[in-house]
Amino acid sequence: HSATCRPWMVKHGVRFQPSLSGALHTARTNAFFMGGGKALVNAYYRSAEKLGVQIHYNAEVDTVELDEGRFVAASVMHKLPDGSVRRERIEARTCVLAAGGFESNREWLREAWGQNERGEYPADQFLIRGTRFNQGVLLKHMLEQGADRIGDPTQAHMVAIDARAPLYDGGICTRIDCVSLGVVVNREARRFYDEGEDFWPKRYAIWGRLVAQQPGQVAYSIIDAKAVGRFMPPVFEGT
C-alpha cells in the first residue's frame, strides 16, 4: 500500500520536506520528513493519544496466546520502578506484532551468519547503529508457534559505519559517506569492490555486507584532498 502510505502519514501529523532538486535518483524514490525520526514518533504519539490509544512503557510482551492460529491474548511483563515485575494478560480481537527484528541478538546473529572460511564469526564484530533492545523475542516465539519463515536471515539494511562507533545506538552519524570518492581496501590492502559502481545513495546500504565478508570485518576508505568537504564528515576525531 505504498501509494497511500504518504497521505496516511500526513493525516497523522507527519510533515514532509519538498522534493530534492538536482538529484533525480533520490527525489523520485525517497520522501524525507521534517525533524527526523523523533518528530515522526512524536507526531504518531499525538495522533494516537487523540484516538484514545493507551501506551504502556517498560512493558514487554514475551508470549502470544493463539487458538488454532488466531490471536487470543498477549502476556505482558511490566517492569516497576522498585524492580519488581507485574504480569498482565491483554485480550483483543486482533493483534499487530510490530516488535522489530533480531539485529541486537548476538547469539541469533552468530547462528545466522555462522563461521567463515577463515574461522571467524563475522557477527561477533558487528556494531549495531540502532537500539540494543531488538532481540527478536516475539519473532522467535511466533516461529516456534508455527508462523511461516520467509527470506534469508542474513539479509539486512547493512551500511559501513565508523569502526570507532559505539556497540549500539550510534545512529546515522556513524555512517561512512566517503566510499564512492576514494579507494576502499581490507586489512590486507586489497580492493574488493567497485567503489563508484553507481550513484552513492543507491549503493551505501550494500557496504556493510561487503565489509563483513572481509578479514576481521574491517576496511579502510582512502581519499585525497580533493574529496574533503564533499561528504558528511565523521563525528569522531582523527583519521
Predicted regions and their residues:
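Short glycine-rich loop/turn motifs that provide flexible caps or phosphate-binding loops at active sites
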Residues: 36, 99-100, 181
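Glycine-rich loop(s) and the adjacent beta-strand/alpha-helix scaffold that form part
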Residues: 83-84, 89-165
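An anion/pyrophosphate-binding glycine-rich loop and adjacent beta-alpha core
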Residues: 139-141, 145-239
